[in-house]
């Protein structure tokens, strides 16, 4: 991969200032103060909120505590989506800090998966990494790794260790020089305006005549409604990690540098904010 290490670091160390508030109907023995945290964009809510859980459990009776879950403006937050994706999709036009409501009862079974332990997060994360490598390298790279390499990827993410993670992840970002890129680009496109969870299709980074495909090419093919006509006004923002990459950016470069740790490009299409 081309080595723009500063970009990789900026992506990894991206943080969202967040204020956690206990839901007003939760029963407490004394008033629950809000809890403030800088959330890592590349991680998962249930992986980085142990302190939040402990903070609120201090003012609650044991019998009133069941599985913790989070909500933003009435929408339950899917823990298996990376934090940065959740923010871009649901809250990118709101003021900071991001205000998240904490619940300990009435778990929304229809909307959320249960997350009883960190093992569940690890299993989900590794499943995504394996799916991404199946698309990129027919699973050859991930299958050639040892168990300890898989563990190092996970521990690097869990403990927020950039160098530990990238020592292994860089192997997943390599490809033979003669091929100009991966077999297919692992991506998911999310929209708040549709019931469909996300769009995911096979898409190559290089065209049959050897031209590098761009982000714009991908959107025109799989989500044409996201792209403004040449003479029309822009109706949507296309966001990855809180920024709007230029539509001319090669998809291969984006995949190598702006993928989340699960090796997918998580792309949010959100309505253009009206001033």
From Swiss-Prot:
GO CC annotation terms, alphabetical: Atg12-Atg5-Atg16 complex; autophagosome; axoneme; phagophore; phagophore assembly site membrane
BP-aspect Gene Ontology terms: aggrephagy; apoptotic process; autophagosome assembly; autophagy; cellular response to nitrogen starvation; immune system process; mitophagy; piecemeal microautophagy of the nucleus
Residues in cross-link Glycyl lysine isopeptide (Lys-Gly) (interchain with G-Cter in ATG12): 130
PTM statement from Swiss-Prot or TrEMBL: Conjugated to ATG12; which is essential for autophagy, but is not required for association with isolation membrane. Acetylated by EP300.
Main subcellular localisation: cytoplasm
Positions where N-acetylmethionine occurs in the chain: 1
Location(s) in or outside the cell: Cytoplasm; Preautophagosomal structure membrane
A matching Pfam family: ATG5_UblA
InterPro entries found in the cross-reference section: Atg5, ATG5_HBR, Atg5_HR, ATG5_UblA, Atg5_UblA_dom_sf, ATG5_UblB
Keywords from the named record: Acetylation, Apoptosis, Autophagy, Cytoplasm, Immunity, Isopeptide bond, Membrane, Ubl conjugation
PANTHER family: AUTOPHAGY PROTEIN 5 (PTHR13040:SF2)
Subunit: Forms a conjugate with ATG12. Part of the minor complex composed of 4 sets of ATG12-ATG5 and ATG16L1 (400 kDa); this complex interacts with ATG3 leading to disruption of ATG7 interaction and promotion of ATG8-like proteins lipidation. Forms an 800-kDa complex composed of ATG12-ATG5 and ATG16L2. The ATG12-ATG5 conjugate interacts with RAB33A; this interaction is bridged by ATG16L1 and promotes ATG12-ATG5-ATG16L1 complex recruitment to phagophores. Interacts with TECPR1; the interaction is direct and does not take place when ATG16L1 is associated with the ATG5-ATG12 conjugate.
Record-stated family: Belongs to the ATG5 family.
Entry function: Involved in autophagic vesicle formation. Conjugation with ATG12, through a ubiquitin-like conjugating system involving ATG7 as an E1-like activating enzyme and ATG10 as an E2-like conjugating enzyme, is essential for its function. The ATG12-ATG5 conjugate acts as an E3-like enzyme which is required for lipidation of ATG8 family proteins and their association to the vesicle membranes. Involved in mitochondrial quality control after oxidative damage, and in subsequent cellular longevity.
The protein, known as: Autophagy protein 5
Gene this protein is translated from: ATG5
């Amino acid at each position: 991969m081309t080595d723009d290490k500063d970009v990789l670091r900026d992506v990894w160390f991206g943080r969202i200032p967040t204020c956690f508030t206990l839901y007003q109907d939760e029963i407490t023995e004394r008033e629950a103060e809000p809890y403030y945290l800088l959330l890592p964009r590349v991680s998962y809510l249930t992986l980085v909120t142990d302190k939040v859980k402990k903070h609120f459990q201090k003012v609650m009776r044991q019998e009133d505590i069941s599985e913790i879950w989070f909500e933003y403006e009435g929408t339950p937050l899917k823990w298996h989506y990376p934090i940065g994706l959740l923010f871009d999709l649901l809250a990118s036009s709101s003021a900071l800090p991001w205000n998240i409501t904490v619940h300990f009862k009435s778990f929304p079974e229809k909307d959320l998966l249960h997350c009883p332990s960190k093992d569940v997060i690890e299993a989900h994360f590794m499943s995504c990494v394996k799916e991404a490598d199946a698309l990129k390298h027919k699973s050859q790279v991930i299958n050639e790794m040892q168990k300890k390499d898989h563990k190092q990827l996970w521990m690097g993410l869990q403990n927020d260790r950039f160098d530990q993670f990238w020592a292994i992840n860089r192997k997943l970002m390599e490809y033979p020089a003669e091929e100009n890129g991966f077999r297919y680009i692992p991506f998911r496109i999310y929209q708040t305006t549709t019931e469909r969870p996300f769009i995911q299709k096979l898409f190559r980074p290089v065209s049959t005549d050897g031209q590098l495909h761009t982000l714009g090419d991908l959107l025109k093919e799989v989500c044409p409604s996201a792209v403004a006509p040449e003479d029309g006004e822009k109706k949507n923002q296309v966001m990855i990690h809180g920024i709007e990459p230029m539509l001319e950016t090669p998809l291969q470069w984006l995949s190598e540098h702006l993928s989340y740790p699960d090796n997918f490009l998580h792309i949010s299409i959100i309505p253009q904010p009206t001033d």
